């Protein structure tokens, strides 16, 4: 049960930070480009890599802190960092085809799912 509390606490903080960072960045640059989301995703990748590099590979990250920081906080802040981390692991293990499938598949199918979901939603309400 405690593991769910770590994830929930991290998730609450991560979603709040995502909202704040994205909103402030978008207002700061006042552009139609989604710079807020772009910034959150890049910050998330940097932070995920930093935490993993520092703690998991060198200093040891207790399982509870992994749940709090990586699963909870980062999971709510951005899943893009997890997507990139998993792609990096595929590259490290020499699985180039799987890397291309993961990156290409998630990008293309994700876009198609958004378009399909929007169309389905509009169809349902019309």
Swiss-Prot record:
GO terms for molecular function: fluoride channel activity; metal ion binding. The chain crosses the membrane at residues 4-24, 35-55, 67-87, 100-120. Na(+) binds at residues 75, 78. Na(+) is not transported, but it plays an essential structural role and its presence is essential for fluoride channel function. Keywords: Cell inner membrane, Cell membrane, Ion channel, Ion transport, Membrane, Metal-binding, Sodium, Transmembrane, Transmembrane helix, Transport. It is found in: Cell inner membrane. It comes from the Bacteria. It catalyses: fluoride(in) = fluoride(out). Its main location: membrane. One of its GO terms (biological process) is cellular detoxification of fluoride. GO terms for cellular component: plasma membrane. It is a multi-pass membrane protein. HAMAP family: FluC. Belongs to the fluoride channel Fluc/FEX (TC 1.A.43) family. Fluoride-specific ion channel. Important for reducing fluoride concentration in the cell, thus reducing its toxicity. This is Fluoride-specific ion channel FluC. The lineage of its organism: Bacteria, Pseudomonadati, Thermodesulfobacteriota, Desulfovibrionia, Desulfovibrionales.
């Amino acid at each position: 049960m405690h593991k769910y509390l770590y994830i929930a606490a991290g998730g609450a903080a991560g979603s709040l930070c995502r909202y704040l960072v994205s909103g402030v960045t978008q207002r700061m640059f006042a552009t139609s480009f989604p710079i807020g989301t772009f910034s959150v995703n890049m910050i998330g990748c940097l932070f995920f890599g930093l935490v993993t590099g520092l703690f998991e590979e060198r200093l040891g990250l207790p399982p509870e802190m992994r749940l709090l920081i990586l699963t909870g906080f980062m999971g709510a802040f951005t899943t893009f960092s997890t997507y990139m981390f998993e792609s990096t692991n595929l590259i490290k293990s020499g699985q180039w085809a799987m890397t291309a499938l993961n990156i290409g598949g998630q990008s293309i199918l994700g876009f198609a799912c958004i378009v399909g979901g929007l169309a389905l939603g509009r169809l349902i309400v019309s």
